[in-house]
């Protein structure tokens, strides 16, 4: 995860075997430059509060490989209305994050996103919780078997 990365950071990590850079707070022009210079696929992270924020995805069409719609503030406890991205129809994978919890209805997310970032939702007191991970994996299997 890179938040408005500067050249020093990019130079330090350029030899690491990342397939993707997940980038927050950059313009399409900055992302294009990073993508070309470092030959990496890009996950463009857009922080969402309202429909106006969602519409920003259009300016990144040429430079992103995966869209990540996340809540404002990079905080695990914050959420946004995931239904705001239901209308997006593009030929690129959509990922959602933002206070997704293990007990949420995964079918709802399955309808609007290709990838779910539930990282914080699988934690208890800041540590990955095996029981939550098991519950989540079982729920994924159920959704897969129903579709």
Stretch-by-stretch model annotation:
Residues 1, 34-45, 84-102, 136-143:
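Alpha-helix-loop-beta-strand connector modules within alpha/beta enzyme cores
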Residues 1-6, 10-33, 40-59, 65-78, ...:
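Catalytic beta/alpha-barrel core
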Residues 12-13, 34, 59-61, 87-88, ...:
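Generic structural signal for hydrophobic
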Residues 16-17, 38, 63, 90, ...:
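Short, structured coil segments at secondary-structure junctions
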Residues 21, 67, 81, 85, ...:
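Conserved, mostly hydrophobic/aromatic
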Residues 24-27, 72-76, 111-134:
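Glycine-rich phosphate-binding active-site loops on the catalytic face of alpha/beta enzymes
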Residues 32-37, 119-147:
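C-terminal helical cap(s) of enzyme catalytic domains, especially alpha/beta-barrels
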Residues 105:
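Short conserved loop adjoining the S-adenosyl-L-methionine
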């Amino acid at each position: 995860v890179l938040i408005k990365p500067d050249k020093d950071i990019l130079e330090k990590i350029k030899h690491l075997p990342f397939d993707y850079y997940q980038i927050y707070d950059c313009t399409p022009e900055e992302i294009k430059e990073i993508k070309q210079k470092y030959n990496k696929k890009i996950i463009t992270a857009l922080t969402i509060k309202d429909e106006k924020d969602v519409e920003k995805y259009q300016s990144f069409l040429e430079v992103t490989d995966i869209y990540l719609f996340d809540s404002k503030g990079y905080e695990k406890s914050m959420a946004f209305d995931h239904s705001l991205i239901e209308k997006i129809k593009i030929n690129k994978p959509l990922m959602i994050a933002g206070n997704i919890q293990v007990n949420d209805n995964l079918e709802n997310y399955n309808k609007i996103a290709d990838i779910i970032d539930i990282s914080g939702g699988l934690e208890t007191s800041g540590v990955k919780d095996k029981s939550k991970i098991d519950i989540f994996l079982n729920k994924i299997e159920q959704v897969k078997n129903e579709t």
